[in-house]
UniProtKB/Swiss-Prot annotation:
Name this polypeptide is given: Large ribosomal subunit protein bL25
Organism for this UniProt entry: Chromohalobacter salexigens (strain ATCC BAA-138 / DSM 3043 / CIP 106854 / NCIMB 13768 / 1H11)
Keyword field: Ribonucleoprotein, Ribosomal protein, RNA-binding, rRNA-binding
Domain of life: Bacteria
One GO term of the biological process aspect: translation
Subunit-structure text: Part of the 50S ribosomal subunit; part of the 5S rRNA/L5/L18/L25 subcomplex. Contacts the 5S rRNA. Binds to the 5S rRNA independently of L5 and L18.
Known function: This is one of the proteins that binds to the 5S RNA in the ribosome where it forms part of the central protuberance.
Family as reported in the entry's similarity comment: Belongs to the bacterial ribosomal protein bL25 family. CTC subfamily.
């Protein structure tokens, strides 16, 4: 599990006007920490450090340490609000985590073995990724950055489902807790859709130059 640390300051100046001033200064990002037994805490984050952190995919599936004026807060990112047309983050939401309580979180899927995939390499199929991430439940200390999906032995016409994913100890898939009918496909190999020449030729023969049906 990656360890991310961000420095933050308590945000005393609140409201829309304060948020606009903060954006105009272009040095800080407004955010809030909530959850647990503590009250919600508005904060500001140093912009360049935060922007660098969110470039890393693992940031969104990791426990993050926020150093709030000398006090440590263990959190996960819950939401990022972006400007509608500028490349700016306008606000971020962080949720406190308790080491003894499970959390639910979406983690990305990393597909391995694409080039060696049996259904693609030997059977001329096409690999289809049906899900880019999955929702898991675990203790904060067990949170994986991602889950691996090995497609090396996946053959033509076959599908890997949620139940086929290897999970780290202490990690479960939220969807499967709702029953077998939620065992969705994650990746599959199907026959390449090359089209049929007959269909195209038939379309040309179906009408004459005047648009009337040919015999």
């Amino acid at each position: 599990m990656s360890q991310f640390t961000l420095s933050a300051e308590v945000r005393h100046d609140l409201g829309k006007g304060a948020s606009r001033r903060l954006r105009r200064e272009n040095k800080k990002v407004a955010a809030i920490i909530y959850g647990g037994s503590k009250t919600p805490q508005p904060i500001t984050l140093e912009k360049s450090a935060f922007y660098k952190a969110i470039e890393d995919e693992a940031f969104f599936s990791s426990v993050i340490n926020i150093d709030l004026e000398g006090q440590s807060e263990q959190v996960i990112i819950r939401d990022i609000q972006r400007h509608p047309y500028k490349a700016l983050v306008t606000h971020a939401d962080f949720m406190r985590v308790d080491a003894t309580h499970e959390i639910t979180m979406n983690v990305p899927l990393h597909i391995n073995g694409e080039e060696a995939c049996k259904g693609v390499k030997d059977e001329d199929g096409v690999l289809h990724v049906l899900a880019n991430d999955v929702e898991i439940s675990c203790l904060p200390g067990k949170l994986p950055e991602y889950l691996e999906v090995d497609v090396t032995n996946l053959g033509l016409g076959e599908t890997l489902h949620l139940s086929d994913l290897p999970l780290p100890e202490g990690v479960s898939l939220v969807a499967l807790s709702h029953g077998e009918e939620h065992d969705f496909g994650v990746v599959s190999v199907t026959r390449a859709d090359t089209g049929t020449e007959g269909d195209e030729e038939g379309g040309e023969e179906a009408t004459d130059e005047d648009g009337e049906k040919s015999e």
